[in-house]
Amino acid sequence: MSEKTFLVEIGTEELPPKALRSLAESFAANFTAELDNAGLAHGNVEWFAAPRRLALKVANLAESQPDREVEKRGPAIAQAFDAEGKPSKAAEGWARGCGITVDQAERLKTDKGEWLLYRAHVKGESTEALVPNMVATSLAKLPIPKLMRWGASDVHFVRPVHTVTLLLGDKVIPATILGIQSDRVIRGHRFMGEPEFTIDNADQYPQILLERGKVIADYEARKAKIKADAEEAARKIGGNADLSESLLEEVASLVEWPVVLTAKFEEKFLAVPAEALVYTMKGDQKYFPVYDNAGKLLPNFIFVANIESKDPTQIISGNEKVVRPRLADAEFFFNTDRKKRLEDHLPRLQTVLFQQQLGTLRDKTDRIQALAGWIAGQIGADVNHATRAGLLSKCDLMTNMVFEFTDTQGVMGMHYARHDGEAEDVAVALNEQYQPRFAGDDLPSNPVACALAIADKMDTLAGIFGIGQHPKGDKDPFALRRAALGVLRIIVEKNLALDLQTLTEEAVRLYGDKLTNANVVDDVIDFMLGRFRAWYQDEGYTVDTIQAVLARRPTRPADFDARMKAVSHFRTLEEASALAAANKRVSNILAKATEPLNDIVHASVLKEAAEIELARHLVVLRDKLQPYFADGRYQEALIELAALRAPVDEFFENVMVNAEEKDIRINRLTLLSKLRELFLQVADISLLQ
């Protein structure tokens, strides 16, 4: 069967830059699935994406499906014909569905009887006939939250479509896709190269587009070029470019022919906090800031043009003129804001609603202030500093700078607090209260910042759960999942002595009578334990290990973490599997027991050597392990408990638990309950698989 290279390119208006990669990857994944479902043999499926195009190139695509033999078994002969030998309705219906008459059917004889049988050789359909619908289906499944239509057409897509190129080898596959007739025409760069040209063979892509159209269609190649050229440009001015992955991706999605240029701004603007300048450069203008080797912002920036100019100084000058007013605004806001102390903004917080039922930002500030002070007392942080940080925590939201540059919240609070002469740990806490902002983000760096960050997040969790607005499905408008995980990470990774029970109760208490959910404390804790499950799964822990610990519902996060590590280590022991099975057996036996058990195991009732030996081990371990459990030394405790494998195996081998004599039976059940209680001090290992 012959194979050829296949190409599809959809030429569009400028596609959303933040969605470009996901659109291209989804297009490739969807089309690959279509090929596989159709049974079309193919090689590598390569995707291309530029601002005005999505394309796929498939190597070694078969020109048709393979031929196949089809067999369809019909009714049994007994049901296929009546007493007179005439075909039954069932037989005729089956034959009609196969496109034959009953007398054309074959007979299939087996040990179980005889059936009607249809056999046919089905010729594979051509790729040319299959591909148009496969492309259309793949495009229809793209993750596009909002479609648009253009002109008088009823066609909907993410952006208007101008060209559709469909080639199998050197042949155009005729089709109408997204309202456009397929062709071999490709559009080049808007301002360079050939605006439009034809491609003779799919193998020429993307090289022909590079040479004639001045478009780098390969997304990764374009991104790599921007990164390399920007690093070189920064090196030439003695600096290092801030090439964050997200901005690199966005810029690579904005240009077809990247040309990296270096520009500058007035040094006086460096008096403004670097974060505000960087926010303007990266967020508004998509520029790359440049730092010196000490990490200090330089009065330069790197940007990417989409055209090669004969006079690049004009482009540089134009970008400098664009950014200057934004930097001047930042300078003005910074100077204006510093005429007031942060504390002076407190009254205005009363005018901003946090949530309709939960009050204003000033109300939230009062709760955070109290809760941060309480947490500080629990973890040994400076209570006065934590209380002060709580009072000032939302004041920067009322400043001109944060109002204009919203992503500078927190960090501007830090700068203004330093200007006001606040304690350094208070100032730092104002910035770090929002950490961790995302998975893998840094945690607050000092105890006061930890107290404030936990207080802010717990206040939100308690409040939103307290009015019954917990996250549902993908909807989480108050980012409660992130808040919960943030609290857990801070407590665990900083090893803080906080209990979710008392922490949540305190957060709820501070709301007074505003909350309507009577089960808010349990709901918040259950939600946070659920985030533990997601976190530890991401960390590589097995589901049954997590379930074993969750079964004990430990509410101290640092303690939860210690149990997780202990159970994970226990699983590596040779005795683990047998003891997990034994615990499961014990759990089942005790679940079926209907008689009340004794408080203690009565030694005088023990008869068999195996039960006497097991009881002896339990007494020794009970006394030895109490300090281990009290100190959270769970890994050491489970290592000691692993020594029970032999006496437990011996017990089940030689002892009848459900003895006829009641006192013996109850004593043995009590013995097993004491065994189980020891393991449950750490986790329910009966859940381990």
Curated annotation (Swiss-Prot):
Gene: glyS
Its EC number(s): 6.1.1.14
GO BP: any one term: arginyl-tRNA aminoacylation
Keyword Cytoplasm: yes
Protein's cellular compartments: Cytoplasm
Principal localisation: cytoplasm
Keywords: Aminoacyl-tRNA synthetase, ATP-binding, Cytoplasm, Ligase, Nucleotide-binding, Protein biosynthesis
PROSITE patterns: AA_TRNA_LIGASE_II_GLYAB (PS50861)
Annotated PANTHER family: GLYCINE--TRNA LIGASE, CHLOROPLASTIC_MITOCHONDRIAL 2, GLYCYL-TRNA SYNTHETASE
Annotated protein name in UniProt: Glycine--tRNA ligase beta subunit
Molecular function per GO: arginine-tRNA ligase activity; ATP binding; glycine-tRNA ligase activity
Similarity field: Belongs to the class-II aminoacyl-tRNA synthetase family.
Catalysed reactions, semicolon-separated: tRNA(Gly) + glycine + ATP = glycyl-tRNA(Gly) + AMP + diphosphate
GO CC, one annotated term: cytosol
Family matches, as Pfam families: DALR_1 (PF05746), tRNA_synt_2f (PF02092)
InterPro entries in the cross-refs: DALR_anticod-bd, Gly-tRNA-synth_bsu, Gly-tRNA-synth_heterodimer
Organism: Salmonella typhimurium (strain LT2 / SGSC1412 / ATCC 700720)
Signal peptide location: none
Quaternary structure (record): Tetramer of two alpha and two beta subunits.
